[in-house]
Swiss-Prot record:
Enzyme class name: oxidoreductase
Complex formation: Monomer. Has a tendency to form higher mass oligomers. Interacts with FUNDC1; this interaction promotes GPX4 recruitment into mitochondria through TOM/TIM complex where it is degraded by mitophagy.
Lineage of the organism: Eukaryota, Metazoa, Chordata, Craniata, Vertebrata
Active site: 73
Family, per entry: Belongs to the glutathione peroxidase family.
Name assigned to this protein: Phospholipid hydroperoxide glutathione peroxidase GPX4
UniProt cross-references to Pfam families, sorted A to Z: GSHPx
Encoding gene (name): Gpx4
Keywords: Cytoplasm, Developmental protein, Lipid metabolism, Mitochondrion, Nucleus, Oxidoreductase, Peroxidase, Phosphoprotein, Selenocysteine, Transit peptide
Length: 197
């Protein structure tokens, strides 16, 4: 076997081993190619709404709700209103909310990141807004690819995100503990929070 071929075969195994090594998992962020090796949300990074790269390790020790959002959806008002309320009531207890704008469903998030930020400000959003991403397909953000295949992150009728405002509850260790469909309002998550906060 040639060195080049051996190198190609070993690279994924070495990368997974490095990500799993104690102390390294928190310092490495899974990329577009190695998301399958990740063991927690904390191994990923994403651009915030202002375009700054954020390593999601900053959420270690916090319970998180991760959701895809849209400004022009019929469920926009109820979701933003309830997410803002949950954040206001539980942030001091250790809840963090990560909102990822996405234009894949009915083109209901067509604006720029700046326009989305201004829209969210109208709801007095204090939780973390991230740059617009894809949540399905080859171009899906690695975090979303990873969340969808976790044992408690799988969907009904396939793992694809079905619509705006699909929500994932993430525990303090960065593991998916529950997935909520787009028709489930954020207040439904509240009953599950005491188990993890």
């Amino acid at each position: 076997m040639s060195w080049g071929r051996l190198s190609r075969l070993l690279k994924p195994a070495l990368l997974c081993g490095a990500l799993a090594a104690p102390g390294l998992a928190g310092t490495m962020c899974a990329s577009r190619d190695d998301w399958r090796c990740a063991r927690s949300m904390h191994e990923f990074s994403a651009k915030d709404i202002d375009g700054h790269m954020v390593c999601l390790d900053k959420y270690r020790g916090f319970v998180c709700i991760v959701t895809n959002v849209a400004s022009q959806u019929g469920k926009t008002d109820v979701n933003y209103t309830q997410l803002v309320d949950l954040h206001a009531r539980y942030a001091e207890c250790g809840l963090r909310i990560l909102a990822f704008p996405c234009n894949q469903f009915g083109r209901q998030e067509p604006g720029s990141n700046q326009e989305i930020k201004e829209f969210a400000a109208g709801y007095n959003v204090k939780f973390d807004m991230y740059s617009k991403i894809c949540v399905n397909g080859d171009d899906a953000h690695p975090l979303w690819k990873w969340m969808k295949v976790q044992p408690k992150g799988r969907g009904m009728l396939g793992n694809a995100i079905k619509w705006n405002f699909t929500k994932f509850l993430i525990d303090k260790n960065g593991c998916v503990v529950k997935r909520y469909g787009p028709m489930e309002e954020p207040q439904v998550i509240e009953k599950d929070l005491p188990c993890y906060l």
